[in-house]
Amino acid sequence: MLEKRYLVLEDGSYYEGYRLGSDDLSIGEIVFNTAMTGYQETISDPSYTGQIITFTYPLIGNYGINRDDFESLTPKLNGVVVKEASTHPSNFRHQKTLHETLAQYHIPGISGVDTRSITRKIRNHGVLRAGFTDNKDNIQELVEQLKTAELPRDEVQTVSTKTPYVSTGSDLSVVLLDFGKKQNIVRELNLRGCNVTVVPYDTSAEEILSMSPDGVMLSNGPGDPDEVDVALDMIRGILGKIPFFGICLGHQLFALSQGATSFKMKFGHRGANHPVKDLRTGKIDITSQNHGYSIDRDSLKNTDLEVTHIALNDGTVEGLRHKELPAFSVQYHPEARPGPSDSNYLFDEFITMMKDFKEKERQINA
């Protein structure tokens, strides 16, 4: 017999379902993700640290979990909410079920709930604090706890690498600042021959420049960009000296370093099906996204940054480029995992930018 579990929201509403994953119950910010596939990559994305994910697709876990498709070594999210969790995956690569994987990483979950109703609530009211309980009598006590709960504010420090390491390539050298990177960023760079040195999020500009890289990337990551201000001086210290590419949180920090401001979105962009328009070409890409903060477009007016991409659903800023220096960024995930590969050409643009910059430096020093 399936054991009952309750998902409780800070507004006092609750949803009755069935136990999934761990019994180590936790609280977090509840969000929704609209991707139809790629649940393993989503669960292991460090950008979800401290959050509870509601999957809008009704069946999750149908092809199981395998060892190769993780985007980080250890998932850090605080919960998973699904309509139906498959107990008998069908895929030749699968090694564990969704339930087994969540239990292994001490992540609680719930199945058998109305995920459409939960998604509408988040969409209409904005993100909420949420938690789980296995005892219906504890619901009101949990509601009161949620109303005053302080959610973690040091997520980047939690997920960033503690020591530098290298993913070997044979051509250009890239330093990747790890704010909670997805592994596919490293894979995409390695596929293009780059030697990638992954360094902690608080590495200084001086330390980066001493490595003599051909380019610098700022990765995705969790949380509020205003709480990672340690990176702003570093960004200002390398701009113009090395080609620069920022993704997601890295994009936001790039903008903040140049005087722009960010804001918390009502319910964010999370999924593998978000349309983005390139303002330079008019081309539309379907993109993978995962962010709850965005850059205020009006705050860019007095900066040296120009908007290159916008979200078609709400018009928010999705891409920036420095008007004079070799530096650009996107709010979405060109590395995908999960999602379409429409935008992985941006890695090629970064490669071209590094080669052009290197050639220009060679000519100057000749």
From Swiss-Prot:
Keywords assigned: Amino-acid biosynthesis, Arginine biosynthesis, ATP-binding, Glutamine amidotransferase, Ligase, Nucleotide-binding, Pyrimidine biosynthesis
Known EC number: 6.3.5.5
Catalytic class of the enzyme: ligase
Annotated region described as CPSase, given as residue ranges: 1-171
Binding-site residues, L-glutamine: S47, G221, G223, L249, Q252, N290, G292, Y293
PROSITE patterns, alphabetized: GATASE_TYPE_1
Gene Ontology MF, one: glutaminase activity
BP term (GO), one: 'de novo' UMP biosynthetic process
CDD domains reported in the protein's UniProt record: GATase1_CPSase (cd01744)
Domain (Glutamine amidotransferase type-1) ranges: 173-360
Pfam families: CPSase_sm_chain, GATase
Catalytic activity, as annotated: hydrogencarbonate + L-glutamine + 2 ATP + H2O = carbamoyl phosphate + L-glutamate + 2 ADP + phosphate + 2 H(+)
Active site, UniProt feature: C248 (nucleophile), H333, E335
Pathway: Amino-acid biosynthesis; L-arginine biosynthesis; carbamoyl phosphate from bicarbonate: step 1/1; Pyrimidine metabolism; UMP biosynthesis via de novo pathway; (S)-dihydroorotate from bicarbonate: step 1/3
Database matches in InterPro entries: Anth_synth/Amidotransfase, CarbamoylP_synth_ssu, CarbamoylP_synth_ssu_N, CarbP_synth_ssu_N_sf, Class_I_gatase-like, CPSase_GATase1, GATASE
Family the entry assigns: Belongs to the CarA family.
Assembly, per entry: Composed of two chains; the small (or glutamine) chain promotes the hydrolysis of glutamine to ammonia, which is used by the large (or ammonia) chain to synthesize carbamoyl phosphate. Tetramer of heterodimers (alpha,beta)4.
Biological role: Small subunit of the glutamine-dependent carbamoyl phosphate synthetase (CPSase). CPSase catalyzes the formation of carbamoyl phosphate from the ammonia moiety of glutamine, carbonate, and phosphate donated by ATP, constituting the first step of 2 biosynthetic pathways, one leading to arginine and/or urea and the other to pyrimidine nucleotides. The small subunit (glutamine amidotransferase) binds and cleaves glutamine to supply the large subunit with the substrate ammonia.
Protein name: Carbamoyl phosphate synthase small chain
Native source species: Staphylococcus epidermidis (strain ATCC 35984 / DSM 28319 / BCRC 17069 / CCUG 31568 / BM 3577 / RP62A)
